[in-house]
């Protein structure tokens, strides 16, 4: 089988290059554990973000944000706030990103061709790639030098709309040859949107990911080493 060659790779994070459990079992709980402190004693940056919710009552604000997290709502204001909170966890060694080893190697090997697109804020994405777990989680490595750029729902739009991928293709100057961009994700709706915008796609199947009803619609891989 002849492997296809691509100019660049657009990578999803959760369920693609990182276990889907990391977000719900590590990142979300860490955020919620610190939510009361954030609301009661916010930094200037956090206060600016909190004010965007337009909720003055602290209890009501807490309940609103808590519900967004528990229901995994892709709210752009929430994503901004989470990035600020997770920074403290990463920098204090409380959070380390469990990127799959095949993904670490792929990103390093294709360092001049890697882009990231996630619902999480660009700030949160950069933190995740700065503090990647290695050596059984005792140390971290920084993958940021291997990544050209990052996109999120604030900069590019939601991941299930083709217009978002159209915008990304224009940003990375591949509007004329979009089939040379390979988008990897575990979410068929995202793949459909990317495909509609002219990008090539691969469905990534990882342990713990939600079952895909028709996984024959897209070419699937179980490791980035297959590319």
Curated annotation (Swiss-Prot):
Q: What class of enzyme is it?
A: hydrolase
Quickly give the catalysed reaction: 5-methylsulfanyl-2,3-dioxopentyl phosphate + H2O = 1,2-dihydroxy-5-(methylsulfanyl)pent-1-en-3-one + phosphate
**Main site of residence?**
cytoplasm
Pathway assigned to this chain's UniProt record: Amino-acid biosynthesis; L-methionine biosynthesis via salvage pathway; L-methionine from S-methyl-5-thio-alpha-D-ribose 1-phosphate: step 3/6; Amino-acid biosynthesis; L-methionine biosynthesis via salvage pathway; L-methionine from S-methyl-5-thio-alpha-D-ribose 1-phosphate: step 4/6
Please list the residues that bind Mg(2+): 12, 14, 186
Keywords assigned: Amino-acid biosynthesis, Cytoplasm, Hydrolase, Magnesium, Metal-binding, Methionine biosynthesis, Nucleus
One cellular component term (GO) for this entry is: cytoplasm
Q: Does the keyword 4Fe-4S apply?
A: no
The protein's required cofactors: Mg(2+)
- Residues bound to substrate are 118-119, 159
| GO BP term (any one) | L-methionine salvage from methylthioadenosine
Location relative to the cell: Cytoplasm; Nucleus
EC number(s) on file = 3.1.3.77
Record-level Gene Ontology MF annotations: acireductone synthase activity; magnesium ion binding
Signal sequence extent: none
How the cofactor binds, per note?
A: Binds 1 Mg(2+) ion per subunit.
Bridged cysteine pairs (disulfide): none
Q: What does this protein do?
A: Bifunctional enzyme that catalyzes the enolization of 2,3-diketo-5-methylthiopentyl-1-phosphate (DK-MTP-1-P) into the intermediate 2-hydroxy-3-keto-5-methylthiopentenyl-1-phosphate (HK-MTPenyl-1-P), which is then dephosphorylated to form the acireductone 1,2-dihydroxy-3-keto-5-methylthiopentene (DHK-MTPene).
Q: How does it assemble?
A: Monomer.
Report the PANTHER family cross-referenced here: ENOLASE-PHOSPHATASE E1
* Family membership: Belongs to the HAD-like hydrolase superfamily. MasA/MtnC family.
- The name this protein carries in UniProt is Enolase-phosphatase E1
